């Protein structure tokens, strides 16, 4: 079940490393955690490395608490929940979702996106 609506979500202190406004990150976390059962949220890729360019998108990984639905459905719901916010902020994005157990299994395999998330990602929630 999605979490109940909240306001003033606290984002992790590591999120201050990102060049994304805190208000955008907080609203993104609120929207995603309201849409899907969320364990954690990471930003990875060029924004996490602080190498973003004007054409860069924000890469987001949502780790879910539950495997009640397929990851694609969780990703779709999470993506729909932040679409307007990201558009209004002028940010393109890619969003992936993983079940927690699948992420934990894959994050040590250097050929997976999960490995990149684990090694360069910035946890903004969870």
Where do the PLM segments sit?
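Conserved H-loop
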Residues: 46
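Short beta-strand->loop micro-motif that forms the acidic, two-metal-ion catalytic signature
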Residues: 59-63
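Catalytic core of pol beta-like nucleotidyltransferases
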Residues: 1-40, 49-54, 64-126
């Amino acid at each position: 079940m999605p979490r109940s609506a909240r306001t003033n979500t606290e984002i992790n202190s590591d999120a201050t490393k990102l060049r994304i406004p805190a208000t955008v990150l907080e609203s993104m976390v609120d929207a995603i955690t309201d849409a899907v059962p969320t364990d954690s949220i990471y930003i990875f890729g060029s924004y996490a490395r602080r190498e973003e360019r004007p054409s860069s998108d924000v890469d987001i990984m949502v780790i879910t608490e539950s495997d009640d639905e397929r990851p694609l459905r969780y990703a779709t719901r999470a993506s729909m929940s932040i679409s307007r916010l990201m558009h209004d902020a002028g940010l393109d994005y890619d969003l992936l979702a993983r079940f927690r157990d699948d992420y934990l299994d894959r994050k040590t395999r250097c050929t997976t996106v999960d490995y990149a998330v684990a090694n360069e990602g910035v946890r903004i929630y969870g």
